């Protein structure tokens, strides 16, 4: 079963003084693992609690996350578990605002490996201190030296 967030509006301010991971205007983690039973059997939690579909949401964000990785206007990242990234789908959403201090920021998602983002708009200012060579990366789990 896919959990869904639809037709929502949010005005979010998030402040993180030092470090962190998976920070998003709607949710830090999103997605469905191909085998959620692995998560239940091994660690006692299920990834079905994370939204798999985010549709028709409008979010204004002001995120200050000094040194944090995978910071996004809507979603921080998929849940990386047992060598596999969970996947999610974001459609018909808009995000505006600012992200300051993040090492690996993204206007919609901080990391979206294997996921789908369609028909979305973003007007998000990312400060000059971001690791701009990593903006939009899908190649590494943690890019910060602090992690």
Predicted regions and their residues:
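Surface-exposed loop/turn motifs in large extracellular/passenger domains
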Residues: 1-105, 109-147
């Amino acid at each position: 079963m896919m959990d869904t967030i639809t037709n929502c509006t949010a005005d979010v301010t998030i402040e993180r003084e030092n470090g962190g991971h998976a920070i998003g205007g709607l949710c830090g983690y999103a997605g469905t693992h191909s085998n959620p039973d692995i998560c239940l059997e091994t660690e006692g939690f299920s990834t079905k609690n994370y939204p798999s579909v985010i549709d028709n949401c409008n979010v204004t964000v002001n995120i200050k996350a000094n040194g944090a990785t995978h910071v996004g206007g809507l979603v921080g990242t998929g849940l990386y578990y047992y060598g596999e990234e969970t996947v999610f789908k974001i459609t018909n959403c808009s995000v505006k605002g600012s992200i300051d201090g993040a090492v690996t920021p993204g206007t919609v998602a901080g990391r979206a490996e294997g996921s789908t983002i369609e028909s979305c708009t973003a007007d998000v200012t990312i400060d000059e201190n971001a690791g701009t060579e990593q903006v939009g990366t899908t190649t590494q789990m943690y890019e910060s030296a602090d992690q």
